[in-house]
Amino acid sequence: VRKISLKNSNIVYDNGKQPLAFHDLSARANNIELSSRSSQPGLSFKVKDYYITTRNLSYKTQFYNMSLGLLKLNKNKVQINNFAMKPLFSRAQFIKMIPVERDLYDLKAAQITAEGEWDLFSRNKIINASHVGIESANANIFRSKIPKDDPKIKALYSKMLRSIKIPMTINNLDLKNSVLVYEEDTPESMGPGKLTFSNFNMNVKNLNSAKIKGKPTKVDIKINCSFMNLSPLSVNWNFDVGDQNDAFAISGKTTNLPASGINPFIRPYLH
């Protein structure tokens, strides 16, 4: 097929549980090749060139509504404006719905961009990005100790990256001008304790899934931020995705933090 195009369309894909809605969707695909697979049933699918743009995309999961103000995607660039992942339920409702402890996320980012090469449609999927940028993100993570503790062993980030099934490499990921807030409560606390990391800037080098033979798999992370809006904090963190033992090294430094600076975290636990 030489060319397929779709212009200014509204499409809703609803499987009964998690509807995906596109508004003002325009798409173009050039030189589409369909061929039978030699060893498996079905058809293989190749696209030489494509371009997709849509506004006000939304997708619901069990606990969240995810939305994008704008998405532009082709085989070399991605632009996402006004990303948000908002809880569908209040904290009190969420606590009643989960059998064991679980984080509740409230996320947004002004813009996410990526440059590189990726193949998302063929049988041999791959992501090889030279740069990913996230600008002005705001992340709130809430955990309640009221539900039972989850006894499962938690996978470290290196193992989680290894679990990605396709080859993926991001040479540089930059998170800029962002805010991270972590809140935690217990059955005895008077509200949640709060840790705030503002003016949050992070660089991640060689984020990967350890699926490309011969390529380095070590990940280096540097973070600079303001801790509790009072003290500079720097963090160096590294791990090797290819290391089955999931070893990691992390160090940090903060200065001039007054004792009262951590009151927002410990005060709710004092009676």
Language-model features, listed with the residues they occupy:
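Strand-loop-strand
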Residues: V100, T255, S260-H271
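Flexible, surface-exposed loop regions and adjacent strand-edge segments
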Residues: P147-I153, P268-L270
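Elongated, acidic membrane-bridging lipid-handling scaffolds
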Residues: V1-I80, W118, I141, K154-I250
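A cross-kingdom feature marking solvent-exposed beta-strand/loop segments within repeated
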Residues: R91-V100, L104
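Short, T/G/N/S-enriched strand-turn elements that build extracellular solenoid repeat scaffolds
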Residues: G69, R123-N124
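Surface-exposed edge beta-strands and adjoining flexible/disordered loops or tails in beta-rich
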Residues: S130-F142
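Surface-exposed extracellular loop regions of Gram-negative outer-membrane beta-barrel proteins
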Residues: M85-Q93, L257
